[in-house]
């Protein structure tokens, strides 16, 4: 099995299964001299865990400590420029909850596809196709964020849920997201209707139901000129990064699919945010707005009631999408340093 690597310059290799001994990442390409912020690493892992800011009633009941162990690549609080390995150990797996899906895969899940493709797979907790795989992405993204803060301090990445099930942010609510503490909302749905969304998800969880939704990522003050002009456009690498996350179903940049309905005189002479901060595959330095849709989670009916599952992945996916964004930014920043002499 291959394809567990991501990146061209800032390269990560992730490993581990949901109910295995540990999950981890090897990072190769992070320059020496970056201040290693262990507090940031722990904070981002905590944000990915179930139960952030009182969200415990609307997410999986699995409680892992996710305490990171840095095995290499850091000394005296700074990166060495050598391969960096970080792991977290699994401590709260309940493999018996998954005995039923060993021979009866969940509808729409990767369970049977992995088994059919490879002939042998780990069904416990979904194995490597589990959402728990994203722990490795968040650890890697934390290091990428450290590097970007070292070279581009003003850059910010803000993720939030813009739609969960039938509930959608208004344009006015969306315009205010950068002023809000997204994590203070149970469902990371920055609206006065956040409790309604939480109630919707709690009801779904109690009834063995699930919901899909949409997450948005806003990149403020990105470095200009990131992205290669043909096969590694910034937008194409961001799309690949997002669509590699489990349960994703669609991707949009800027005006997205709405651009198909707009006349050229409106699109090109209107607000610049229609481009989403990227033109010709290269960042302009303006804010970048990205949107990704998620299908309803596959653990439904009796499987959902017996196990510990999320009724909607969007809430938990926000830190993961932010991490993938930082990875793409770090990768393209290092790449941009070789664009010209």
Curated annotation (Swiss-Prot):
<comment type="pathway">
    <text>Metabolic intermediate biosynthesis; chorismate biosynthesis; chorismate from D-erythrose 4-phosphate and phosphoenolpyruvate: step 7/7.</text>
</comment>
<comment type="similarity">
    <text>Belongs to the chorismate synthase family.</text>
</comment>
<keyword id="KW-0285">Flavoprotein</keyword>
<comment type="function">
    <text>This reaction introduces a second double bond into the aromatic ring system.</text>
</comment>
<keyword id="KW-0028">Amino-acid biosynthesis</keyword>
<dbReference type="Pfam" id="PF01264">
    <property type="entry name" value="Chorismate_synt"/>
</dbReference>
<keyword id="KW-0521">NADP</keyword>
<protein>
    <recommendedName>
        <fullName>Chorismate synthase</fullName>
        <ecNumber>4.2.3.5</ecNumber>
    </recommendedName>
</protein>
<feature type="binding site">
    <location>
        <begin position="128"/>
        <end position="130"/>
    </location>
    <ligand>
        <name>FMN</name>
    </ligand>
</feature>
<feature type="binding site">
    <location>
        <position position="280"/>
    </location>
    <ligand>
        <name>FMN</name>
    </ligand>
</feature>
<dbReference type="GO" id="GO:0010181">
    <property type="term" value="F:FMN binding"/>
</dbReference>
<comment type="subunit">
    <text>Homotetramer.</text>
</comment>
<feature type="binding site">
    <location>
        <position position="308"/>
    </location>
    <ligand>
        <name>FMN</name>
    </ligand>
</feature>
<dbReference type="InterPro" id="IPR035904">
    <property type="entry name" value="Chorismate_synth_AroC_sf"/>
</dbReference>
<dbReference type="GO" id="GO:0005829">
    <property type="term" value="C:cytosol"/>
</dbReference>
<feature type="region of interest" description="Disordered">
    <location>
        <begin position="109"/>
        <end position="134"/>
    </location>
</feature>
<keyword id="KW-0057">Aromatic amino acid biosynthesis</keyword>
<dbReference type="InterPro" id="IPR020541">
    <property type="entry name" value="Chorismate_synthase_CS"/>
</dbReference>
<dbReference type="GO" id="GO:0009073">
    <property type="term" value="P:aromatic amino acid family biosynthetic process"/>
</dbReference>
<dbReference type="InterPro" id="IPR000453">
    <property type="entry name" value="Chorismate_synth"/>
</dbReference>
<dbReference type="GO" id="GO:0008652">
    <property type="term" value="P:amino acid biosynthetic process"/>
</dbReference>
<feature type="region of interest" description="Disordered">
    <location>
        <begin position="45"/>
        <end position="64"/>
    </location>
</feature>
<feature type="binding site">
    <location>
        <begin position="295"/>
        <end position="299"/>
    </location>
    <ligand>
        <name>FMN</name>
    </ligand>
</feature>
<keyword id="KW-0288">FMN</keyword>
<dbReference type="GO" id="GO:0009423">
    <property type="term" value="P:chorismate biosynthetic process"/>
</dbReference>
<keyword id="KW-0274">FAD</keyword>
<dbReference type="GO" id="GO:0004107">
    <property type="term" value="F:chorismate synthase activity"/>
</dbReference>
<keyword id="KW-0456">Lyase</keyword>
<feature type="binding site">
    <location>
        <position position="48"/>
    </location>
    <ligand>
        <name>NADP(+)</name>
    </ligand>
</feature>
């Amino acid at each position: 099995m291959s394809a567990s690597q991501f990146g061209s310059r800032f390269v990560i290799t992730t490993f581990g299964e949901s109910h295995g001994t540990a999950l981890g990442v090897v990072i190769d390409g992070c320059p020496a001299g970056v201040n290693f912020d262990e507090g940031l690493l722990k904070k981002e892992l905590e944000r990915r865990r179930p139960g952030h800011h009182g969200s415990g009633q609307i997410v999986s009941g699995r409680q892992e400590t996710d305490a990171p162990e840095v095995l290499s690549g850091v000394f005296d609080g700074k990166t060495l420029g050598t391969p960096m390995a970080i792991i977290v150990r699994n401590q709260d797996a309940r493999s018996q909850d998954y005995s039923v899906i060993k021979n009866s895969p969940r509808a729409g899940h990767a369970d049977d596809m992995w088994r059919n493709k490879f002939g042998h797979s780990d069904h416990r907790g979904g194995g490597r196709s589990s959402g728990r795989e994203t722990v490795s992405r968040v650890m890697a993204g934390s290091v990428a964020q450290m590097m970007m803060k070292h070279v581009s301090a003003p850059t910010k990445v803000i993720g939030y849920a813009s739609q969960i099930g039938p509930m959608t942010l208004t344009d006015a609510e969306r315009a205010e997201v950068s002023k809000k503490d997204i994590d203070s909302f149970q469902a990371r749905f920055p609206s006065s209707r956040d409790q309604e969304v939480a109630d919707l998800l709690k009801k779904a969880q109690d009834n063995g139901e699930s919901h899909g939704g949409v997450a948005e990522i806003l990149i403020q003050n990105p470095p200009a000129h990131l992205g290669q002009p043909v096969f590694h456009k910034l937008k194409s690498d961001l799309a690949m990064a997002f669509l590699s996350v489990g349960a994703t179903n669609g991707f949009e940049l800027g005006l997205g699919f709405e651009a198909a309905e707009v006349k050229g005189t409106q699109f090109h002479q209107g607000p610049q945010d229609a481009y989403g901060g990227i033109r010709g595959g290269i960042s302009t330095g303006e804010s970048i707005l990205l949107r990704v849709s998620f299908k309803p989670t596959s653990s439904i009916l009796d499987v959902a009631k017996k196990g510990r599952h999320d009724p909607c992945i969007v809430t938990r996916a926000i830190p993961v999408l932010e991490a993938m964004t930082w990875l793409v930014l770090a990768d393209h920043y290092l790449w941009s340093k070789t664009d010209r002499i």
